[in-house]
A protein has these predicted regions:
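Short, small/polar-rich loop/turn modules that mediate ligand/substrate recognition or access, typified
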Residues: 180, 185, 242-244
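Catalytic Tyr-X3-Lys loop
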Residues: 96, 107-124, 138, 142, ...
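Short C-terminal tail/terminal secondary-structure segment
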Residues: 2-7, 232, 243-256
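Amphipathic alpha-helical dimer-interface segment in Rossmann-like NAD(P)H-dependent oxidoreductases
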Residues: 78, 117-135, 176-177, 181, ...
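Catalytic loop of short-chain dehydrogenase/reductase
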Residues: 142-167, 172-173, 177-181
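Conserved glycine-rich Rossmann-like NAD(P)H-binding loop of the short-chain dehydrogenase/reductase
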Residues: 31-47
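Canonical Rossmann dinucleotide-binding motif of NAD(H)/NADP(H)-dependent dehydrogenases/reductases
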Residues: 4-36, 175
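Conserved mid-core segment of classical short-chain dehydrogenase/reductases
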Residues: 74, 97-112, 135, 154-160, ...
Length: 256
């Protein structure tokens, strides 16, 4: 264990099979939290659990779990509360997005699917976890917007993704207002391009990586751990006076 910053806290982290969700689950457990995870891809979740066992980290998981299905979300929340008697931290890291230029985008299979996979999944988890956070006397919700909630993604057909992440940003500010009387804090992290299984293919597109690097003040691509460190702060009591805020973790891209 790296520290006891999250000791005694119960964290529910979605999308632990890869990327940011995996990074947050491992980081939280290393700092003392009990972690319940989930993923729609069972194999990825099992890989994360294997890593956790090697380090003797307290991570369990419910998988496969389709967060666009309200029944699956409720099952996840109930399993977490049954195992740990409550929820202190909710990290909505799982997301799915389809990329297409507007003239080619299908309304049902791409636009609506992306809003379900980036916005609905956050709403459903927050709604189901809400009464349990209230019962604990408050807690921390950590959602993920994006640099593309602020700026266009040049050279990429990211219209639905930008809309979904912009929605997460606005929704989280409203959640912060509604949660404040209950001691519930809600914040967003807006990552730049993070190297994950989902982004590696696009990084191979000729010229794309170079375009991204040209926008960065800090000349390296982000890693899941860069985001997990910020999430650890927001999950901890160190951030007890922080709510309705957005943290840009993007190598300086949106400051240029």
């Amino acid at each position: 264990m790296l520290s006891n910053r999250l000791s005694g806290k119960i964290a529910l982290v979605t999308g632990i099979g890869s990327g940011i969700g995996k990074g947050c689950a491992l980081m939280f457990a290393r700092h003392g939290a009990q972690v319940m995870g989930c993923d729609i891809h069972a194999a990825g979740a099992e890989d994360t659990l294997t890593l956790a066992r090697r380090e003797n980290l307290p991570i369990t998981s419910l998988h496969p779990c389709d967060l666009t299905n309200p029944a699956d979300v409720q099952r996840l929340i109930e399993a977490t509360v049954e195992r740990y008697s409550g929820i202190d931290i909710l990290v909505n890291a799982a997301a799915f997005g389809a990329f297409a230029w507007i003239e080619e985008m299908d309304y049902t299979t791409q636009w609506k699917a992306t809003l379900a996979g980036e916005l609905d999944v956050v709403f459903l988890a927050c709604k189901s976890a809400w009464p349990h956070l209230i019962k604990r006397g408050g807690g921390s919700i950590i959602n993920f917007a994006s640099a593309n909630a602020y700026v266009a993604l040049a050279g990429s057909p990211a219209l639905a993704h930008c809309a979904g992440k912009g929605g997460v940003l606005a929704m989280t500010r409203q959640l912060a207002m509604e949660g404040a009387p209950h001691g519930i804090r809600a914040n967003t992290i807006s990552p730049g391009l993070i190297v994950t299984g989902a982004t590696r293919p696009v990084l191979e597109v000729p010229g794309f990586k170079e375009n991204v690097m040209n926008k960065l003040m800090l000349k390296r691509l982000g890693q899941p751990e860069d985001i997990a460190w910020c999430a650890t702060y927001l999950a901890s009591d160190e951030s007890s006076w922080v709510t309705g805020a957005d943290f840009s973790i993007d190598g300086g891209a949106t400051a240029m």
